[in-house]
Amino acid sequence: MIDHKHISLSVILTMAAFEMAAGQELAQAPRLVVSISIDQLRSDYLEAFAPLYGEGGFKRLLNNGLVYPNASYPFTPVDRASAVASVSTGTTPSYNGIVGGRWLNKETLRPVTCDSPGSLSVSTIGDELKVATGGKSVVYAISPFCDAAIMSAGHAANGAAWIDDRTGKWTSSSFYSPYAGWLNAYSSLTGVISAKEWTPISDLVGNFSYFLSGGLSKPFKHKFNTERKFIQYKTCGLVNSDVTSLAIQCMTSTSMGQDAVTDLLSITYYAGNYDHKPLNECQMELQDTYVRLDEDIARLLNDIDQRIGLSKVMVMVTGTGYTDEDNADYEKFKIPSGTFYLNRTANLLNMYLGALWGQGQYIETCFGREVFINHKLIESKQISLAEATKRSQEFLLQMSGVRNVYTSQQLLSEHNPQLAKVHNGFFAERCGDIIIEVAPGWKIINENTQESTHSRASYIQFPIIFLGAATKAHKVETPVTTDRIAPTIAKAIRIRAPNACMSEPLF
């Protein structure tokens, strides 16, 4: 005879055991993820200034973390906005739509910036965390810069904070929840900027250069009292301290990491040249920036460790994969170089197309390294876009300094491994019909907008580092790409990766 009571009791005990196991597994998920992007971080500088670091910042990350020293972005070109967007979405501009900090609106033919989460075409890791927890997770992003804050916050975040270029106040977007009280109460730079002075953090940092030129150097002193004072301040070594203080205030005020529901804090630091000057004009400033950043990372990690415990937190650190363009005088040293005038070339191209098909404004405009064809005109003349771009490509390839020319048709239809990075950086709705690549050492100048871009194909080495929960100290020399960061975090906190992410987790 079957003992139904015994079976029922067995089923109950088995289910209870499964629930306990599931609960234990869930408890292992990090309570907090801290995603740190360091704008223009370079591994060679990171190593060069190592004698100046303490034990709790960069050294703690490199010695105790899971380090991937050979990281890269799987698309080109890269800037701060596109890099941060790629980290948070786990994909490239061809899917997330962030082709750069600025692009041309095809309707108005005017530049637009990514100052709204609506610019993102896909979900971020923060968005997916909000969905997975029914909105219970706390998600914030903090950066000196608007684009980085918004691109890392995503659509569903509680908020994003950055320093306003005009007022110096920590501000946010109306897209998110109403201003948090703790952010409103946080002091702005408005009343104190004139009293701030940036000098070397120590005599050693201020008097001895660890750059290749090396040796003794004069210390620097900078005040912030011009019309551009807040913009300049955001590129100095002091700004990272403000970011760290606000990040700690955010975690404290919102009780991040204090319960079993995972929270996410995205932070952007700055490690580029002061006021975007050439490196030879700000070597000591850059050295000081790295040393101060080392102290700020140590302060952040210590605060997290004391309040939550690093074993319950996943910290991710990476760079943005580019640096400010350096106006190197190649001509002086007889290195091949030159200037490609985009606006002049566009006019010549328009004349060439006019000779083929009759007079008309075939070229609507040009922007960055892109040329935009007048679609309405070629349609009225019954000329296909494929034909117009092909003819344009053939003409432009004959110009001095042009290394390659890509057409929108080519990037959308061909699956050529050699074009992979260019294809991944192309988003049809926000890019031109023709993309020009000039030879290394050449620069593109648009005299109409007074903008210039330089061509340098060399690789900027930077790391991806994980510290804390689910990681052990180890160095992985295998080259990896940054689109694998988001799925790695998603796996660690047991949620879906962002909806356009097709890359595998790093571990």
Model-based region annotation:
Residues 29-34, 64-68, 95, 134-139, ...:
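Loop/turn elements at helix/coil->beta-strand transitions in domains of secreted/extracellular proteins
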